[in-house]
Amino acid sequence: SLDGEDTSGWNAENWRKRRTKLQAVFQDASGTLNPMRSVRSNVEEAMVNLTCLSKRQRRERIGELMELTHMEERLLDVPARQLSGGEQRRLSLVRAMSIRPKYLVLDEVLSGLDLISADAVMRVLEQYHREFDCAFLLITHDMDSAYRLSDTILTMQAGQIVRVGIKQ
């Protein structure tokens, strides 16, 4: 369910209408980015399609999110294909957060990042949660990051929930 609505019978149109509430960031960020487009264009595309912000408001929000994710402004006009893996992952986060969703699905977003980059991404997520009251569904094998970012942790095995824990 999403906001109390049963989603089991939803078609593509139902999901499309609710994309502003729910966004996802995947382990392979390059799959959600257009490698030929600039960083700015990749983010603005989502904002144009899913928000009613003016061009000025979009530019301001992109600047704020670039700063929040510690991405240099000079990267705005660089094609996404020229970014490192960590930068692509952060750009994917910027893109998802740019429309201010209520829910973020984070699929192995820390996987493959060095410790410094992973910590930076976790700090971004913690700050974003505090500022915008966004809930996360964090899919990870890293129990330390799960504990750091989660209130409730479900442990799954073979597709089944085997344990539920609430952080105290």
Whereabouts are the PLM-identified features?
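ABC ATPase NBD coupling module
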Residues: 6-23, 41, 49
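Conserved ABC ATPase "signature" region
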Residues: 57-74
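Conserved ABC ATPase signature
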Residues: 79-83, 87
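Conserved catalytic motifs of ABC-family nucleotide-binding domains
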Residues: 100
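H-loop/switch region of ABC-family ATPase nucleotide-binding domains
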Residues: 140-141
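A short, surface-exposed alpha-helical micro-motif characterized by mixed small hydrophobic
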Residues: 146-148
